[in-house]
């Protein structure tokens, strides 16, 4: 074989790895295998496990948002707030102490943590991943591990931002709803207080009697007015003309009208034109009765002629009328074509009625859409447009908005929606009393999804543990089993069970249609039950598959459905084995065979810098971090408003009604006059006897009159005192009750002030404690960082001393592991010298 000349770069020998050593970007073939050998397996697994835990913890920390339970509690308390004021003063006091909850949270308010902390977590995750990768795969493993750690931390960061935005939106929605409910509670209480004040004024207005003078002043005026109005309406219903002299005589019956049973013109006062130029007329043969013709000098008469001519379908009259008034073609042509051609005797009335009920801008064809009667029909393209205009739900506010719209179509739709809401306003059959015949299938058509619903779903009963059963819009319920609208039917299950629809809920809807038409048919019921059981079985099978797949993902050693065996690798499309990689590196021709490394058995020493790195990163994060006062803000956000109470004053007062003395005096006068007349009649003409009797009677009359006056005065005085005492007691009771309520409200306000003072004190103490802890943490991080730097410098100083000793020959090896030899007498011993033999003279 011919020798090939190898070009050298400079004076570097071609085989630069003959003596071993580290190489950048390449490792020996035993690097990966050594990491998982028996003696190194524990360290490798521990390093990887620790790195994975740290990376996962960094991602979770970056994705975590602040605790919003305090904000949610505030919203709930605001939503359930009840205004307890019973007077205007209490209402104003409670209104003054009430505060709206915040409803403009941004995603930064609920994000929690700080940017510096997340930066620190990201750097730490990347460092842990790089360290774990380096312990297994060298520099390439370090790069891979760093990328994995960095991706996990950044993914958690971005996921936390999205989660905070959704949470802020939800909190703002709940806060706005709570504020609206609180304002509604204030408005309702204000209306109730105003009504109670009116009742109190009415009770006190005539506490001592007197005419009320309501209405028009006459007693029973309002009742009589309503009675007369009802009589008037009754007369109108009976076709009585109440304003005419014969208003109490009914009009003639309909069969006495000139109903043209035998034909004739609609009006006798017609202009027949001149003899030379008479108006076109309808001959008598075209009418129901003879001896009449009908001129058509005007369009109104022409319309009448068209209607009358249509009785017999006379085309000649129709042509005459339309020749004189061509404009009636668009009005009456198609109408009477359909009338004549479709059994006029049955549909004439409906056709005319539909024409006169049409709106001016509609055409005659539009007037004929309901000429045969039936339900109201809405075009398919127009269905749901007004509901969409209202945002999915038609309300009174949306109807008012639509009726005030500048678009005439929107106004018509709003009017139709308003009328449709009153179709059952006066009652109707609600399918009660056993008349609700269903097949047992329930459709959940409203409520939104579990994520959209503020109550996490629509409750349908509770389970044996008391937890509510929640469903969402789109699902179908049958026999306490819910068919999901989220789970899509796999193709193999759809073919096996012969299901229709994309989801199991749609399949259930399709399967129940036949039974919906015949809910009481036993065969349909059995078929429905069998179909639902088949769909339920298919859904359970699909759910079991999903659970099995989820369990396989939870335990990486199980690959029942396949998957990536190394989720943290590079996921190469064409993976290679270690032997293939070694062969590829040998064949590259750039370098020689990599010699085995001589220091593979040495332990890692770079971890001794971990405390310094950690303290440095913590100190770096302190530059961007701020103390977290969320707990203190949670306490300060609690509403400590005063609770006000009210009282209901008693309006039960007595009226003073004195004894009517004049009534009894008149009675006595009548009795005395009768006595005198009787004495005079029985005296027999003897004036002395009459005079004596009259004097005695008058004496008794005077005595009785005096007794009546005195006793009546005493009775009235006692009655006045009793009435005043009773009313005084009522006023005292009302005053005492109001005083107690005022005292309670004052004490409640004072207690609220003391509570707010305690709240402010607690918040200040918490904030100061948090501030002190933050300062101590910063000081500890800086102290540890400086202490670590000092320890590292002291270690380097000692290493320099050892290197100096090794260099001077005292030690045979320096701190880098290099052999330095040392002096020949380094081990000590006896010094041997050459001595002369013989006798020596001194």
Swiss-Prot record:
Region (Disordered): 1-29, 817-842
Keyword Lipid metabolism: no
Keyword Coiled coil set for record: no
Entry keywords, A to Z: Host membrane, Membrane, Transmembrane, Transmembrane helix, Viral genome ejection through host cell envelope, Viral penetration into host cytoplasm, Virion, Virus entry into host cell
Origin superkingdom: Viruses
Biased composition (Low complexity): 20-29
Annotated segments matching region Interaction with the portal protein: 425-552
Predominant cellular place of this UniProt entry's protein: virion
Topology within the bilayer: Single-pass membrane protein
Stated name of the protein: Cargo protein 1
Originating organism: Bacteroides phage crAss001 (Bacteroides phage PhiCrAss001)
């Amino acid at each position: 074989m011919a020798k090939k000349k190898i070009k050298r770069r400079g004076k570097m020998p071609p085989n630069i790895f003959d003596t071993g050593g580290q190489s950048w970007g390449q490792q020996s073939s035993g690097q990966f295998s050594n990491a998982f050998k028996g003696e190194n397996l524990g360290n490798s697994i521990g390093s990887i496990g620790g790195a994975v835990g740290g990376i996962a913890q960094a991602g979770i920390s970056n994705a975590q948002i602040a605790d919003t339970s305090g904000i949610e509690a505030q919203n709930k308390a605001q939503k359930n707030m009840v205004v307890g004021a019973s007077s205007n003063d209490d209402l104003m006091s409670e209104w003054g102490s009430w505060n709206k909850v915040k409803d403009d949270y941004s995603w930064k308010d609920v994000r929690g943590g700080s940017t510096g902390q997340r930066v620190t977590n990201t750097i730490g995750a990347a460092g842990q991943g790089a360290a774990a990768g380096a312990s297994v795969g060298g520099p390439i493993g370090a790069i891979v591990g760093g990328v994995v750690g960095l991706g996990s931390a950044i993914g958690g960061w971005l996921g936390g931002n999205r989660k905070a935005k959704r949470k802020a939106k939800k909190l703002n929605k709940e806060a706005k709803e709570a504020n609206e409910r609180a304002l509604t509670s204030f408005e309702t209480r204000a209306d109730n207080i105003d009504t109670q004040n009116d009742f109190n004024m009415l009770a006190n207005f005539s506490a001592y009697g007197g005419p009320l003078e309501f209405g028009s002043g006459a007693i029973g005026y309002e009742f009589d007015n309503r009675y007369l109005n009802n009589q008037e309406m009754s007369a109108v219903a009976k076709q009585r003309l109440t304003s005419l002299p014969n208003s109490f005589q009914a009009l003639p019956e309909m069969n006495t009208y000139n109903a043209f049973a035998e034909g004739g013109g609609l009006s006798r006062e017609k202009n027949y034109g001149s003899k030379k130029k008479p108006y076109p007329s309808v001959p008598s043969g075209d009418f129901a009765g003879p001896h009449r013709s009908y001129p058509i000098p005007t369009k109104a008469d022409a319309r009448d002629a068209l209607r009358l001519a249509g009785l017999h379908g006379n085309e000649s009259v129709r042509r005459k009328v339309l020749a004189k008034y061509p404009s009636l073609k668009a009005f009456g042509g198609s109408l009477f074509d359909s009338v004549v051609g479709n059994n006029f005797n049955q549909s004439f009335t409906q056709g005319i009625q539909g024409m006169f009920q049409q709106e001016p801008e509609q055409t005659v064809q539009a007037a004929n859409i309901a000429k045969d009667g039936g339900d109201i029909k809405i075009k398919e393209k127009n269905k749901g447009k007004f509901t969409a205009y209202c945002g999915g739900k038609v309300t009174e506010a949306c109807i008012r908005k639509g009726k005030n719209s500048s678009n005439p179509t929107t106004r018509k739709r709003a009017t139709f929606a308003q009328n449709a809401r009153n179709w059952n306003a006066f009652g109707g059959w609600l399918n009660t009393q056993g008349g609700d015949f269903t097949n047992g299938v329930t459709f959940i058509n409203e409520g939104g999804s579990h994520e959209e619903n503020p109550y996490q779903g629509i409750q349908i009963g509770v389970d044996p543990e008391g937890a509510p059963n929640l469903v969402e819009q789109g699902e179908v319920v049958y026999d306490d089993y819910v068919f999901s609208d989220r789970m899509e039917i796999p193709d193999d299950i759809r073919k096996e069970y012969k299901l229709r629809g994309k989801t199991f809920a749609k399949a259930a809807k399709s399967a129940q249609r036949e039974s919906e038409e015949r809910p009481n048919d036993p065969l349909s019921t059995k078929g429905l039950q069998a179909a639902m059981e088949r769909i339920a079985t298919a859904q359970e099978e699909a759910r079991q598959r999903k659970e099995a797949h989820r369990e396989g993902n939870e335990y990486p050693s199980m690959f029942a459905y396949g998957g990536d065996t190394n989720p943290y690798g590079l996921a190469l499309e064409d993976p290679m084995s270690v032997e293939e990689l070694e062969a590829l590196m040998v064949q590259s021709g750039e370098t020689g065979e990599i010699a085995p490394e001589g220091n593979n058995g040495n332990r890692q020493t770079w971890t001794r810098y971990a405390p310094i790195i950690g303290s440095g990163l913590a100190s770096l994060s302190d530059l961007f971090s701020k103390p977290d006062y969320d707990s203190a803000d949670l306490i300060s956000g609690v509403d400590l408003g005063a609770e006000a109470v009210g009282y209901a004053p008693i309006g039960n007062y007595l009226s003073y009604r004195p004894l009517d003395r004049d009534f009894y005096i008149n009675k006595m006068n009548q009795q005395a006059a009768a006595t005198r007349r009787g004495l005079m009649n029985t005296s027999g003409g003897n004036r002395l006897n009459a005079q004596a009797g009259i004097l005695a009677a008058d004496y008794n009359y005077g005595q009785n009159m005096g007794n009546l006056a005195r006793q009546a005065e005493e009775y009235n005085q006692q009655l006045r005192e009793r009435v005043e005492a009773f009313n005084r007691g009522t006023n005292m009771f009302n005053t005492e009750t109001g005083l107690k309520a005022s005292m309670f409200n004052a004490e409640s306000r004072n207690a609220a002030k003391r509570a707010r003072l305690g709240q402010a004190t607690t918040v200040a103490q918490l904030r100061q404690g948090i501030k002190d802890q933050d300062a101590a943490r910063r000081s500890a991080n800086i102290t540890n960082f400086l202490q670590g730097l000092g320890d590292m410098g002291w270690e380097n100083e000692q290493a320099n001393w050892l290197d100096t000793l090794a260099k001077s020959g005292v030690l045979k090896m320096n701190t880098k592991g290099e052999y330095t030899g040392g002096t020949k007498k380094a081990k000590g011993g006896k010094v041997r010298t050459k001595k002369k033999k013989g006798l020596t003279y001194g």
